[in-house]
A protein has these predicted regions:
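N-terminal intrinsically disordered, cationic/polar leader segments
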Residues: 1-122
């Protein structure tokens, strides 16, 4: 796996239409195996107590985010599909429902990008 700088830009819109734009940077690693792209990094923005190991696995029409640590979950996003996941935190577990509207990616020799648009319900 190659060392990479990871930049995550997120635009979040709540039910009232309020938009918040967030950007996080991390050092991580990238590799491709069996036609799937893997990005690994330590997420320091999910918990004030510890960094959370995070893996992004990208296939043709599916993206999976796997977190294992103080916060743990396995969220899958399937293009034009609905998926469910349990999101475990020290404060309890939430059931998440993701509706994936757009999923695309572009990888070149020295850089890549993933574009994901989804709506989220938390129960």
């Amino acid at each position: 796996m190659d060392s990479v700088e990871i930049i995550i830009r997120a635009k979040q819109k709540d039910l009232n239409g309020k938009v918040e734009i967030v950007e996080h940077k991390a050092q991580g690693s990238y590799g491709c195996k069996g036609g799937k792209h893997y990005i690994r990094y330590m997420d320091k923005h999910l918990s004030p107590k510890e960094q959370v190991p995070t893996v992004i696995k990208l296939g043709d029409r599916e993206l999976t985010i796997i977190r294992q640590g103080l916060v743990s979950s396995r969220q899958s996003f399937i293009l034009q599909g609905e998926t469910r996941a349990d999101y475990h935190t020290p404060y309890g577990t939430m059931e998440l429902v993701m509706h994936t509207h757009e999923l695309s990616s572009e990888f070149q020799e020295s850089q890549g990008s993933i574009h994901l648009v989804y709506s989220l319900e938390a129960n």
